[in-house]
Regions:
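Sec-dependent signal peptide recognition
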Residues: 1-9
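Hydrophobic h-region of N-terminal signal peptides that target proteins for export
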Residues: 8-18
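Beta-rich carbohydrate-recognition and catalytic domains
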Residues: 19-205, 209-232
């Protein structure tokens, strides 16, 4: 009886031993659940809500319209750059959508540079850097790849699932297109075909250089059994 009791207690102690700590190295980890938490006492996970502050930009120009969205913020040296969609509504596949650009030195006071690149709102006297269906969700990033070429310091993804109209290329296949720019203002496609074709692409599709894995990564929306999901 004593031997059986000892063996049972020993087995129980093995079953309740704490698991070995997970080695995450230098990776950043997002605490969205308790997977990385061994124990907690007197605390809990809480999703913090954003607090509305002062308005720093009003999208009231003729080429911007009432359905601006998908804002991307990039800090390049002393400049804070903000990219967003200009649209008066309508189809996601319209070539009337534009990508706008403003910049600031403090992240509060933004100015619209008069670029003179693309006609929108009846004039080229605007801050538009791209026009076409890809502007529906054009999302740029500053490439931190140590081997990046100077003429490709900025990169972006943009596009929708179904074929759409492009301002100067006619109808283009559906999917996400890759863009490059030396300065964040003058953009061109890396290739004429989309680089990702499987997905919904109806939201902001994010890409970046993953220094941990030494490769580019992208996150976009997809529907799995009619349920919204994220793919990478």
């Amino acid at each position: 009886m004593k031997a059986a009791t000892f063996l049972s207690a020993f087995a129980l102690s093995l079953g309740t031993q704490a698991a070995e700590p997970l080695d995450i190295g230098s990776r950043w980890e997002l605490f969205v659940d308790e997977f990385l938490v061994a124990s907690q006492k007197g605390l809990g996970l809480k999703l913090h809500e954003p607090v509305r502050r002062e308005v720093v930009l009003t999208t009231d120009k003729p080429w911007e319209g009432p359905t601006c969205g998908y804002f991307s913020v990039i800090q390049d040296g002393r400049k804070v750059r903000l990219y967003y969609r200009g649209s008066a509504g309508g189809s996601d596949h319209s070539d009337a959508q534009v990508t706008c650009f403003v910049e600031s030195e403090d992240g509060i006071h933004f100015t619209r540079p008069k670029l003179g690149l693309i006609e929108a709102g009846g004039s080229k006297d605007n801050n538009v850097v791209w026009r076409g269906v890809e502007s529906h969700n054009f999302a740029p990033f500053l490439d931190s790849n140590p081997s990046v070429r100077p003429e490709e310091r900025y990169k972006a993804l943009g596009g929708v699932k179904l074929p759409g109209k492009n301002w100067h290329q006619g109808e283009t296949p559906g999917g996400l297109y890759a863009f490059v720019s030396p300065d964040g203002v003058h953009w061109k496609k890396m290739k004429t075909e989309p680089v990702i074709t499987k997905g919904a692409f109806d939201s902001q599709n994010l890409a970046f250089w993953d220094s941990t894995r030494s490769r580019y990564a992208s996150y976009s929306r997809i529907f799995s059994n009619k349920v919204r999901a994220i793919q990478s």
